[in-house]
């Protein structure tokens, strides 16, 4: 009712890219635990939250546990907002020394598309239109703006993602690829994954669900 306060005790499960995990996990956890009592109002509801503990897991690797099929040997390509994390998996173990990271992820992609549209049409396209194109795939008929957007998205798959993997000496016809993260939709809709041994995990919450599952497993020990 009016004036009620939503009180909860919570555990935080969060993630870091595998390449940065060992170096940053303690400082990241300390940052999350810095303010353990939180009092705030959101959309008219007052919250009183107590953080009991926080654990840090490997980003991309967490989403892996939700992937269907035999992924005991595969290459996880986690396309997030800030980074693309490339995580080799051998016999269900993550090979940290072989992990790679790129900053040409979805935020970079959206800005690049906006710059391309402005340079060719002298007008701006909104970020929401690009995100809609990423999620829904190409629609027909296409206007002059969407034509540029679709081409940029297709080129991104070929020139940024697949070519990057080839530069790291991965044989795309022989390597099982598992695309996760919000950018997996780009590969699914514009990257012709059926031409490769590729699976696109479309649940953008897969990493978060992985953190929750891994945390619950630890709590039950």
Label for each model-derived stretch:
Residues 66-93, 113:
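Gly/Thr-rich phosphate-binding beta-strand-loop-beta motif of the actin/hexokinase/Hsp70
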